[in-house]
C-alpha cells in the first residue's frame, strides 16, 4: 500500500512564480545502522491543489514518478515558476487554499524486487520565489534579496 502525506500551504501570492522543492533525507539521517532495504530510493507522485478565481477546487499533477538518490539529501524540483491564480496571504482558513500532496508511487513488483521503498523521509517543502535559487550537483543556494548575500546548503 502506498502512503500519502498532505501539506497545507499558507500565504501564497497570486501571479508570482514559485520554484517548488521537496527536500528528502536519506535513511542514514534517521538511523546510522539503516539496512540496504531501508536505504532504497523513493519514487514519489506530487500533486498541487488550489482554489481558482471562482473558488473551485483544482488539482494539478506536478510529478508522477520523481525518484530520490539514496544516501544523500535530495532537493527535488517539483515545479519551476509555478503561479497560483489566487492569493491566500493573510487568510485564516478553515479549508486550506493550497495543498501539496506527496504520495509514494511504488508498485508491488518494485517493492518486492527491492527497487524502491514506500517509506517517506521528507525534511521539508520549500516555495521559493522564482529566480533566487540555484541548484547544482553539490549545493542548493538562495540569494533572497539580490544584495550579494546568499545562503546555501551542501548536498553531500
Predicted features by range, described:
Residues 1-156:
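Extracytoplasmic
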